[in-house]
Structure formats: structure tokens, C-alpha cells
Amino acid sequence: MSVTRINQQTECPSSVHDLVSCWGGCTQSKTSTDSGLEKRFELNFAQPVDIGTVTVKQLASVMERAGESLRQNSAELGIHTLKFDRSLLVFTAKQIVVRSSVSVMLHEAVHPMLELMRSHNIIVDWASFMRVNYGSPWDMTSETSDIMAHEYAELKSAFPTGHPYLAGPVDRDHCFYFVYDGIDRDPSSCRRENDVQINVYMYNVQADDEYDLDGNTKEQQLLVSHCAGEYETLRVSTYGSTHPFASFETNAVSAASDITKIVNGLLKKFYPERVLLVLLQDRDAQGTTACGVMDRLEGFTVVHRGANHFGGGYVFHQATYARSA
């Protein structure tokens, strides 16, 4: 398949002109200043894979295309973890998830990652790319609109049938979310979709000496393995933001059943000014326990809340909160 490399061009492909015009054009950014907190890229596999078939060197080579250098890697309970300067990559039998600072041009790793999967005969049947912004993409003090235009063009080139979404108020905390869905949902396949993904983004956090927020260390990355393929990750960072922030993610079933306690524990520990909560819930996920956390954030009031119901039966919940007076 012919691939258009927009990161080597000053113009976007004609197929995406209508949408990128909303962002003010598609010129090359010069300083990569960005009014965002984090980017997230996920690939889901049609069949479970042997994570040992893809080497650390190969994954690190892909991330080098986005300007990242490998610092540390480990393997535990069926989860391979790669820590880079500003990114955290988690590889399981079902998926690859990369979370990074907005200063990383993560979209430049999209095509290389797909090419790596194809070289191992790994079929990707679902993918997403999410960025969390704390201000308007058209803010004149940043180049967010240009960077987002290139992200969208690269994603649309890689996944022509994928679609972009915006969740939340565009002039303050919101998410840009691109989704490709190629899952075969033929009833005869008897495939169950029961994943739950929970993300908590905390703005302008405070913490004790456990995290060196004011020192030379710009990024702290932690991962806890629950069981095969289930994990919790935490990034505490000052990259790409004037204030330190923390972001938490889990796909663990045990965490989903007790997520209210976990989230309130994070808020007590980091004492953020604002919080953005994201929940992606598959159609076969048992119960709605995880959604209940959105009503019970101690010490915070809702600024905005919404949900996007996808045709595949899964739901993207998003809510923003401000600390109560």
C-alpha cells in the first residue's frame, strides 16, 4: 500500500484538507510548543500474540522515529515495559500502548509501528490515538493546531477508515480522539469485548519527596503488573507544561471494581487543581461500576461531562472537574 509521509512534506494529502483546514492549515511546526499534557497511541490485535517474537531492539527502533531513546526495559507477568526519556510503552499479548509527553511527535511512530506488526504477521483490528489538551488548539502562543493537523493526516493515511472525535470544551480541557475499528463482530465468532480502560489526568499537582517535581528529573514512570496483560501505570512529568502533572492508567479488572477508591486516593496524594477523567468501556464489560466514579470525586465539582457511544457497542466517557472552593 502506498503511504503518504506527511512529516516529510509541507502540505497535507488532499484527502484530509477539509478537516485540517479547521485547525488553521498544515504547516510544519518550528518549535513544537503544544498546549497539551499527554499523547496516547494504542494498537489491539485480532489474535493474542507471543510478545517474545517482537524484540526490544525493534520496538526501540520504532520509537527512535519519534525522537525517543530507550532508558530501561523489563518483562513481568506477560507484560513487556519499555521506558523512554518521555514515553512509556506497554506490550501485552493483546495490545501495544504508548503514552508520551506532548513534546514527543508520537504520530511519526504510527507507520513504523504498523510496519513492524506486519513484519511479524500480527493483525491490528483496532487502534486509537488520543491527545489531552488543556487549552484551545488555536492559542497563538503554541503550535498545537499545526501539530494536530499533521497528527490527523498521518493517522488518516495509516487508517483510511478511521475517524476523529473531540470530547470536551475546545477552549479548555478536552480530548482529541482518533479511532480505527476493524473488528469482525460476526456473531459466529463468539468474540467477547470486555476491556475497561481508565485514565486520570491531574493538572498542577503537588506531591511529597517521592517524586522530584521541582528538581532536574522531568519524568517519573511507574508500572504495576496485576496479572497477565493487566496493569497500572503512572507518569509524573513537567515536560510540555508550565506546571507538573500526573497521569494514571489502568486496564485491570480488579481496579475497575474499586476505581472510586483508587481515584480518590490519587487526588488526595497529588492534590491537583483540575482533573480530567476518561473511561473507555467495551460492550461486554460486566456492570457499570467503573462509571460510578464520575459521580464521586471527593472535593471536586463537575465542569463538563459527556459520552460518545460507538457503533461497535463501546462507550467513551469523559469528564472534567475543578477543585471545590
Curated annotation (Swiss-Prot):
Pathway assigned in UniProt: Amine and polyamine biosynthesis; S-adenosylmethioninamine biosynthesis; S-adenosylmethioninamine from S-adenosyl-L-methionine: step 1/1
SUPFAM superfamilies: S-adenosylmethionine decarboxylase
InterPro entries recorded: AdoMetDC-like, S-AdoMet_deCO2ase_core
Cellular component, GO annotation: catalytic complex; cytosol
A GO biological process held by the record: spermidine biosynthetic process
Gene3D superfamilies the record matches: S-adenosylmethionine decarboxylase
Keywords: Polyamine biosynthesis, Spermidine biosynthesis
Mutant phenotype after disruption: RNAi-mediated knockdown at the bloodstream life cycle stage causes cell growth arrest followed by death. Putrescine levels are increased and the production of spermidine, glutathione, glutathionyl-spermidine and trypanothione is severely reduced. In addition, protein expression levels of ornithine carboxylase (ODC) are increased.
Coiled coil is among the record's keywords: no
GO MF annotations, alphabetized: adenosylmethionine decarboxylase activity; enzyme activator activity; enzyme binding; protein heterodimerization activity
Quaternary structure and interacting proteins, as annotated: Forms a heterodimer with S-adenosylmethionine decarboxylase AdoMetDC; heterodimerization is required to activate AdoMetDC.
Sequence similarity: Belongs to the eukaryotic AdoMetDC family.
Job description of the protein: Probably has no catalytic activity due to the loss of several residues required for processing and catalysis. Forms a complex with S-adenosylmethionine decarboxylase AdoMetDC which is essential to activate AdoMetDC. Required for the biosynthesis of the polyamine spermidine. Required for growth and survival during the bloodstream life cycle stage.
Record's protein name: Inactive S-adenosylmethionine decarboxylase prozyme
